[in-house]
Amino acid sequence: MIPGPATLPDLLDRLQVVALPMRVRFRGITTREVALIEGPSGWGEFGAFLEYQPPEAAAWLASAIDAAYGQPPPVRRGRIPINATVPAVPPAQVPELLARFPGARTAKVKVAEPGQTLASDVERVNAVRALVPTVRVDANGGWSVDQAAQAAVALTADGPLEYLEQPCATVGELAELRRRIEVPIAADEAIRKAEDPLAVVRAGAADVAVLKVAPLGGVWALLDIAAQIDIPVVISSALDSAVGIAAGLSAAAALPQLQHACGLGTGGLFVEDVAEPAIPVDGALAPQRVAPDPARLRALGAAPDRRQWWIDRIKACYPLLYRRSGD
């Protein structure tokens, strides 16, 4: 991860920090903070979640630099099918949430959230299944193997699942679960948070690889990993702003094959974004570069103390880019 022409003073000089209000609580937060960098090639987004320490967050900074200073890959397709995203909400809220994803034929439903029960997960999934033909669920590693096996039975009692995303935390658990159930398994955290992102595939622990641009270090880094994977790839958002979504669409548009809907419709989870949200047409988005609206940047600007927090974070992450590259 070599930043190339992006010096630290240059990055900080080009920095904008925004706080995006969310419609519903997601990943335990109601406001999403991200740092945006305007470079010679466009805008990049640094939005590593607040609890991530510099060694993990550095890849997210590399992704922002890649977008702001690098060149995008060639486009292979002009239409990216997307899935709707349904947080851990009561079933009554499901129709309103799905209405923000016009034409989407696939929905990803959050399950295994703290404080939730399997029964409430089943109710939520069935409410989604009544409105969308293809349903996948995401447990974010929240189950043990036995719990995941039980959940697979309960969640498929009234219809199939496209896949279980990260039902358990470790590669070993995923491999054991895959031997025990027939529902396909997708790996997310087991790829993006691993020292070796290919280990889960080599272990035969997943049927689908969920890849996210920012945690993997940028579009080109993601495409390099995807080229080494012999299972289908789904490109997904890391709760990105419109800038980060554009990077995800660029990656999805460059893949040689794209079999599944991508998780790149999460802009609908924000009350306000830095650019006008792209509206899906027949359940799909078109890849395009995005430039934030100056008025929105001003209106959504983070408080001075939060801006300084992100500056300090970039200063802590930046030296690690060279260290990861062996320089």
UniProtKB/Swiss-Prot annotation:
Residues annotated as catalytic: K110 (proton donor), K212 (proton acceptor)
InterPro entries: Enolase-like_C_sf, Enolase_C-like, Mandelate_racemase_C, OSB_synthase_MenC1
CDD domains for the chain: OSBS
EC class of the enzyme, as a word: lyase
Cofactor: a divalent metal cation
MF annotations from Gene Ontology: magnesium ion binding; O-succinylbenzoate synthase activity
UniProtKB keywords: Lyase, Magnesium, Menaquinone biosynthesis, Metal-binding
Lyase in keyword set: yes
GO biological process: menaquinone biosynthetic process
Catalytic reactions on record: (1R,6R)-6-hydroxy-2-succinyl-cyclohexa-2,4-diene-1-carboxylate = 2-succinylbenzoate + H2O
Source domain of life: Bacteria
Pathway: Quinol/quinone metabolism; 1,4-dihydroxy-2-naphthoate biosynthesis; 1,4-dihydroxy-2-naphthoate from chorismate: step 4/7; Quinol/quinone metabolism; menaquinone biosynthesis
NCBIfam families reported in the protein's UniProt record: PRK02901.1
Recorded family membership: Belongs to the mandelate racemase/muconate lactonizing enzyme family. MenC type 1 subfamily.
Functional note: Converts 2-succinyl-6-hydroxy-2,4-cyclohexadiene-1-carboxylate (SHCHC) to 2-succinylbenzoate (OSB).
Name of this protein: o-succinylbenzoate synthase
The organism of origin for this protein: Mycobacterium ulcerans (strain Agy99)
Phylogenetic lineage: Bacteria, Bacillati, Actinomycetota, Actinomycetes, Mycobacteriales
